[in-house]
Amino acid sequence: MAGTSPTLESLNLKAIKGKKVAIISAQWHPEICDNLAAGAEMIFKAAQVEYETFTVSGSFELPLAAQLKLDQGFDGAVVLGLVMRGDTAHFDYICQGVTSGVMQVSLDKSKPVGFGVLMCDNLAQAVERSNVGLGIGNKGEEAALAVLALWNLAK
């Protein structure tokens, strides 16, 4: 499904001055996750937002990592990963756990957590969603823009 996400031009960048964000990426599928992180970093650089990038073992660890970083004083987080469908129910359990966990952290902390965890049937889908800077749907870029938009909303 295609839609529109905020653009840097549509946001009040003065409203986000002084914010700091944690970009947290899973280590599985580095060829995809590194591109997602690069997309998020590109957005935050362009918006002149301070960021630090961290890695965790896998996508299941993303919610706790986001919570820890928000507890350490970060104003928001972006979580990035790839869960690839296999032959067992593992995919369903991981996807549900990560999605619920990330949402709960954001609600509990009242801070934005951009969701850039891909849940794909095959590698081609993941590649399509992790192209950097081509304006064609890097989900790391979109997750970063979502954080910026929520900071705008909170002002």
Task: Please identify what each model-predicted range represents.
Residues 43-72:
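Active-site rim loops that border cofactor/substrate pockets in soluble metabolic enzymes
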Residues 92-120, 139:
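Short, acidic/small-residue loops that bind anionic groups at enzyme active sites
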Residues 61, 65-102:
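Glycine-rich phosphate-binding loop
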Residues 134-155:
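A charged, well-structured terminal subsegment
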Residues 121-140:
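Phosphate-binding/catalytic loops
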Residues 1-17, 134-135, 152:
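N-terminal presequence-like segments and the immediate start of the first folded domain
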Residues 11-53:
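Glycine-rich phosphate/diphosphate-binding loop of Rossmann-like nucleotide-binding domains
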Residues 5-13, 110-125:
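Mobile beta-alpha loop/short-helix "lid" or hinge segments that flank ligand
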